[in-house]
């Protein structure tokens, strides 16, 4: 039990000067919050002015002494081993009955041993918390009895949001709230888990020009906010919130950097995810990757060694900038999200109605690490595939379970007549909108698919989860997706501070099976280095072992990584599918990877190869054929003692026979023996219905895949475990 000194006297700021009270740019005599102070009290920002004293009600700063005590050292998980888990402080544990009630939904609850054990057993290395800066909801939400649950309505950059602290800490004051936040970080670090904060530096809670004067606007409206034509009453909005902070102003850049250093040095967090990060890099002529703020992130001695992640867009002109941020920033990869959903859901929905989809080309590009987006840095290839924070879902949008249950958003509960939230979901309800009983069917079949809806939905969830975990890059899982959390079709639950948004821990049998599957897939990722590359694939042969044989590789169609070469008899134009340095369109063949003609005898196998359903290389036509829905990806062991990994997938609506490929025998080595370690057709990774003898196969063997399924094979060489993570 820590003893906290009584809070220091309040530290509000009084506006004074000739500006009239009604002016949109000031409030003479009013109280405003100091955005640079570390503590916050007051919870009635929108009450009418009290001519006697508004201080007891309005949010205002309190000076907080620097906290004492040493924090546990940062885990410093390498990017290649990183698994991000996006969570809301309240939503993660509010329904976790294994926690004492007073800890649920709090900073302390996130670091409770039960919550930590869940994260560790899942395989999470890094928790990314939705905003924890002090924030206030918008007036129109409060007027309708709602709140901004996500917290993207920042009041100040320093003080933590007190409502996420335990009641005891709130009653003890801002110093106790800060101690609880630091204690959370400390305990997570002791468990080997990093903490990233989602920070909102692009706008504030003060709304548009007719908004309230709570802090920044009352202090210096013209100096802090981006304006249209320099007129204080005409705000330029590139964030969709009514205002945007002006990162052309040194004072704004300084405020953001000071805040980041404070949270890193005093609170001990391991990094940040920057909301609408393009706004933070906007200069006089638009987004600039050499913007002073971004340069500071690269050079500041406190910040440059942290994990930094950009949300690479905003809603202003030229706002989509995925792949264009400088190192050391990683970026949310929306192209990965779209490609995974498109292949497994939207294209499958189209196919069920007899319409063509998009083929395998874009999916292959994302599985290979999205080099078309992240392989163009200066110097070239300095970022690598780990710069792609790949995800299928995030806090905004459908949950993983809802992606397979709804074709359309169901947001009426948000109070905006279902106008809010995106309509570009790329989802598929599998024939019936909304929840179904475990044995529900659509007339017994699904438009020609003789399967029940519920099992097929569950398989689609597993396909999406496996695509995320097996892809080159940094996977991000949204809290609860590993347990089938639903928001009942709401794809914009920002106002739902209730069971709609909170993670449910009361698991039905299928949700327990899904959790076991998620743990199994992340364990496979940890165990096999071929699934965790930190450099882009080249498609070229790896160096042979000192005593390894030289042999011929007869055109295995690997150029999906390098996108170079002319292609021999067996060469393909797979560079267009998953090219790296040159980008997807730059590839002309797989010759350098798989033989530039008969008689060429490289000394080793390539790091990446692609095959069709017959076990042969994909030709140019196949890469561009929307009807091709089956793909095999072979990643060879990066070091002796590691295992090769073969991923076999089909988006076809009927079962498919696939011939397993091989590379090592063609190179004069020992033929592969493939061991089946996972199949998305399995409800549980230890599926008792697995057929005897199906777990092992040789190259050339023909295996049967269920419709819309994915398999993972590995060579039997014992893998080396990645350090520092649970088995």
PLM ranges: what are they?
Residues 1-171, 383-406, 422-425, 708-710, ...:
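N-terminal structural segment of carbohydrate-active enzymes
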Residues 1-85, 90, 107, 438-458, ...:
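Carbohydrate-interacting/catalytic domains
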Residues 3, 89-94, 133-135, 202, ...:
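Short, solvent-exposed loop/turn segments at secondary-structure junctions
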Residues 37-38, 44-45, 51-54, 88-269, ...:
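Substrate-binding/active-site clefts of carbohydrate-active enzymes
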Residues 80-82, 150-155, 219-220, 238-240, ...:
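Short, solvent-exposed loop/turn segments at the edges of secondary structure
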Residues 82-83, 125-128, 192-194, 270-271, ...:
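Beta-sheet entry/capping signal
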Residues 271-276, 336, 428-434, 494-502, ...:
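Short acidic (Asp/Glu) and glycine-rich catalytic loops that position anionic groups and cofactors
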Residues 283, 288-479, 484, 492-496, ...:
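Conserved alpha/beta catalytic core and glycan-binding cleft of carbohydrate-active enzymes
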């Amino acid at each position: 039990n820590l003893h906290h000194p009584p809070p220091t006297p309040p530290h509000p700021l009084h506006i004074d000067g000739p500006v009239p009270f009604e002016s949109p740019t000031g409030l003479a005599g009013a109280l405003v919050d100091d955005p640079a102070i570390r503590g916050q009290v007051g919870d009635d920002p929108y009450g009418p002015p009290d001519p006697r004293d508004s201080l007891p009600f309005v949010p205002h700063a309190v000076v907080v002494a620097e906290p004492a005590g040493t924090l546990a050292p940062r885990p410093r998980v390498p990017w290649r081993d990183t698994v991000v888990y996006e969570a809301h402080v309240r939503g993660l544990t509010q329904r976790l009955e294994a926690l004492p009630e007073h800890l649920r939904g709090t900073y302390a609850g996130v670091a409770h041993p039960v919550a930590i054990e869940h994260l560790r057993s899942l395989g999470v290395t890094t928790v990314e918390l939705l905003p924890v800066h002090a924030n206030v909801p918008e007036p129109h939400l409060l007027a309708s009895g709602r709140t901004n649950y996500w917290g993207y309505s920042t009041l100040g950059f320093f003080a933590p949001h007190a409502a996420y602290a335990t009641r005891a800490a709130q009653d003890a004051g801002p110093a106790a709230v800060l101690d609880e936040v630091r204690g959370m970080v400390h305990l997570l670090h002791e468990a080997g888990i990093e903490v990233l904060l989602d920070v909102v530096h692009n706008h504030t809670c003060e709304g548009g020009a007719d908004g309230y004067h709570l802090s920044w606007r009352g202090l210096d409206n013209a100096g802090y906010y981006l304006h249209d034509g320099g007129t204080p009453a005409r705000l330029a909005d590139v964030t969709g919130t009514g205002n945007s902070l002006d990162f052309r102003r040194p004072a704004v850049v300084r405020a953001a950097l000071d805040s980041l250093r404070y949270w890193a040095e005093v609170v001990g967090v391991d990094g940040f995810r920057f909301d609408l990060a393009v706004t933070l890099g906007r200069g006089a002529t638009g987004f600039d990757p050499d913007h002073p703020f971004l340069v500071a992130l690269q050079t500041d001695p406190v910040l440059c060694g942290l994990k930094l992640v950009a949300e690479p867009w905003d809603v202003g002109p030229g706002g989509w900038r995925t792949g264009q941020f400088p190192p050391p920033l990683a970026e949310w990869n929306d192209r990965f999200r779209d490609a995974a959903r498109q292949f497994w859901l939207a294209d499958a929905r189209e196919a069920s109605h007899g319409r063509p989809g998009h083929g395998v080309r874009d999916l292959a590009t994302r599985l290979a690490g999205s080099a078309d987006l992240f392989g163009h840095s200066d110097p070239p290839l300095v970022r690598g595939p780990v710069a792609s924070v790949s995800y299928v879902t995030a806090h905004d949008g459908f949950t993983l379970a809802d992606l397979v249950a709804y074709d359309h958003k169901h947001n009426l509960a948000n109070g905006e007549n279902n106008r809010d939230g995106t309509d570009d979901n790329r989802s598929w309800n599998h024939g019936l909108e909304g929840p179904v009983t475990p044995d529900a069917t659509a007339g017994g079949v699904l438009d020609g698919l003789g399967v029940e809806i519920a099992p097929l939905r569950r398989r689609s969830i597993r396909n999406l989860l496996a695509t995320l975990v097996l892809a080159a890059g940094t996977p991000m899982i949204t809290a609860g997706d590993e347990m089938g959390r639903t928001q009942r079709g709401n794809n914009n639950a920002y106002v739902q501070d209730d069971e709609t948004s909170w993670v449910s821990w009361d698991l039905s049998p299928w949700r327990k099976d899904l959790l076991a599957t998620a743990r199994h897939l992340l364990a496979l990722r940890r165990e096999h280095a071929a699934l965790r590359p930190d450099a882009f694939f080249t498609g070229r042969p790896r160096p042979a072992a000192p005593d390894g044989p030289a042999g011929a590789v007869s055109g295995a169609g690997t150029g999906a990584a390098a996108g170079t070469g002319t292609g021999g008899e067996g060469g393909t134009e797979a560079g267009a599918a998953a090219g790296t340095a040159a980008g997807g369109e730059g590839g002309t063949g797989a010759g350098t990877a798989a033989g530039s003609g008969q008689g060429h005898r490289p000394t080793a196998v390539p790091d990446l190869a692609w095959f069709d359903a017959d076990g042969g290389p994909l030709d140019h036509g196949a890469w561009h054929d929307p009807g091709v829905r089956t793909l095999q990806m072979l990643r060879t062991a990066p070091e002796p003692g590691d295992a090769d990994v073969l991923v076999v997938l089909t988006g076809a609506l009927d079962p498919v026979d696939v011939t397993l490929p091989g590379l090592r025998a063609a190179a004069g080595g020992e033929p592969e023996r493939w061991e089946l370690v996972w199949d998305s057709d399995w409800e549980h990774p230890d599926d008792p219905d697995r057929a005897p003898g199906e777990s092992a196969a040789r190259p050339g063997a023909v295996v049967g895949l269920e419709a819309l399924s994915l398999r993972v094979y590995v060579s039997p060489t014992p893998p080396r475990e990645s350090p520092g993570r649970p088995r």
